Each structure stands twice: as C-alpha cells, then as structure tokens.
Amino acid sequence: MSQSDLHQQKFHWQGRHDAEDGKLGQRIHHVVKHQKTSELEKASQGVSILGFATDAGVARNKGRIGAKKAPDLIRRALANLAWHKDAPLYDLGTVVCDDDLLEESQSRCANLISEALPHTPTIVLGGGHEIAWASFSGLAEYFKTHHPEKKPKIGIINFDAHFDLRAFESSLADVKPSSGTPFNQIHHFCQRNDWAFHYACLGVSRSSNTQALFQKADELNVWYVEDSQLNYLNHSYHLTQLQHFIDDCDYLYLTIDLDVFPAATAPGVSAPAARGVSYDTIAPFLERILHYKNKLMLADIAEYNPNYDVDSQTARLAARLCWDIANAMADKEHKRQPIK
C-alpha cells in the first residue's frame, strides 16, 4: 500500500464568516474537524465524513472517468452550508485509488469505515459507485469485529438508475469488479456468510439496464421501483413498500448514485439520465429513510464527475444530500442499538 493511498494533504475547510452573528452564524467549515479514526474514541458525538477518490471502477465499466476528483469538490460545496446542530463533524481524509489498484484501495477505505463506525455514523463521498463495495465491506467488518456472534439484517437502499448487479467474475468473459458490480459482490458476500441480502433500488431505468440485469434482480428478490413509476400518483403505495422494507431490517446503509437525477439537475455524472427522477420526487423517500436515523449507520454519495458539471450544480446537489444525511445522523442516539 503506497503512501499516496491516503491523502497526507488535508482539505482546507474555509468559507463565509459572519462574525456579527456569533455562534448562530456557524457553517459547516466552522465545525468540521480533521480527525484520525484512532482518535474518534475520545471525540464527542458527531458524524464522520470520509472521501474515496476513485474512478478505476468506472473505467473498468467502460464509463467516463473524472469521479476521482469529486470528494474535495463536494467538500468545497458543503463548506458554506449553515450548520444548526451542536454535534461536530469529523473529516477522516480521503482514500485515493491510483494505478487501477481498486481492490487495495477499497480494502483501505473499508478498514477506515469499520474503525469509525463504533464511534460515529459515517458518510462516504465518492468516487464511482465502486465505493459501495468498500462501504458495505467496512460495515461488515464492523459487525464481524464487534458482534461476531450475530448475523445483522442490513437493508441496502440505493437511489440509482442502474442495478449495479453485473457479473464480477465469469468463465465466459474477462470481467473484473467495477462500478457496475458492487451489489452483486455484496450478494456473494452475504451468501458466503449466511447473511440475508436485503437490497432496494429506487429510480432504476429500464432503458439503461438489460434484460439480464432485470432477471438478476428478480432472482435475488431485489425490491425495485423504476423511474417511470416514481411519481406523485404512486407515492403512497411506494412509501408503504419502503416502510415494510425498513421494518424488516435492523440497520440501514443508504447509497445515492447521482445519475438517478435528470441530466438537467445532475449533468456532472458518468452516465447522465435522459429521464431520471427529480429531487422533489425522491425527497419523501429520503425523508422516510432519514427518519430512522438510529438504524442508519452508513451512507455514501457516488458518481459525481466534475469534468461534466455545469456551474458546480451537481456538486451543490451532492453537498445538499450530504447535508441532509448529516443532519439526521447528528441526532442519532450515540449508543449503538443492539442487534436483534
């Protein structure tokens, strides 16, 4: 593992300062603290933010690279947002994937997540959606270390135009783990460890997923809602389904691929959506998930690609999503809920 795999240069948080407002004028950049995971035990209750600078998985998936530059640009958009909570935020730095060393950097990212979770809920800023395998691996490592006797029921909720259930190993083709494979990798992990696989994909596009992927989703009993079905007429029904999904799980892992939003809202992604799902449409589902903050241990935001952004609007969208999640996590009970 090279020295470059973790940023030695810390992100410099800065932004507007309204001295006349005192503490009531605080913004994210005022409260965030650089912290090592080894120091979190001494820290007060808060929320950790970790960057994962990677687009190696996107390249392997034949996508448009650029997401590697995303974490610090999301931080920059996040810095000036107002912060109304007493809970601090901790910046754990950024894991960097160089030279297609995806598996090694995913392992490093997972280790940091597993070290942070005993003390704080964590938000990971990607990076391509290969970050999802690192995120779940860190969550799994946390449970195996701290609750080895239990098999946690983890609900994975993915807002995404794609299932990301592609094969990551095959005798018929030369395939590798990529941004298109993480939830298939997670399924294989759950199968090997006799854990239940609870996966929901909301906003999936029929035009962007082949019959093979829909068949795979059906085989794995994935609960999915297509982009064309996510509308105000169907809100009540799908929110009820989401409630059942949440009720069936002890813990939640939320992952948001920014390509679920329309290209007009999120142009800065590898695979922009011609249709997509509006933020207003997704908001009630996100609010329902965040209501269960004591189940929500981990979240990540994936696929921001600054190479194709317009006036940083996708960065601001990612930052607002991070802000929404952090606000909910900041009110989380500090003591971990027991596994049922």
Swiss-Prot record:
Biochemical pathway: Amino-acid degradation; L-histidine degradation into L-glutamate; L-glutamate from N-formimidoyl-L-glutamate (hydrolase route): step 1/1
The coenzyme or cofactor needed here is:
Mn(2+)
On cofactor binding, the record's note says: Binds 2 manganese ions per subunit.
Record-listed E.C. numbers:
3.5.3.8
- Give the GO biological process terms: L-histidine catabolic process to glutamate and formamide; L-histidine catabolic process to glutamate and formate; putrescine biosynthetic process from arginine, via agmatine
Q: Which reaction does it catalyse?
A: N-formimidoyl-L-glutamate + H2O = formamide + L-glutamate
| Top enzyme category | hydrolase
- Enumerate the GO terms in the molecular function aspect: agmatinase activity; formimidoylglutamase activity; manganese ion binding
SUPFAM superfamilies reported for this sequence:
Arginase/deacetylase
Q: Which residues bind Mn(2+) 2?
A: D160, H162, D257, D259
Going by the UniProt record, its keywords in alphabetical order are: Histidine metabolism, Hydrolase, Manganese, Metal-binding
Q: Which domain of life is it from?
A: Bacteria
Intrachain disulfide bonds: none
**Residues reported in the UniProt entry to bind Mn(2+) 1:** H129, D160, D164, D257
NCBIfam families recorded for this chain? hutG
**Family designation:** Belongs to the arginase family.
Q: Cross-referenced HAMAP family, in alphabetical order?
A: Formimidoylglutam
Known function? Catalyzes the conversion of N-formimidoyl-L-glutamate to L-glutamate and formamide.
Protein name, as recorded: Formimidoylglutamase
**Species annotation:** Vibrio parahaemolyticus serotype O3:K6 (strain RIMD 2210633)
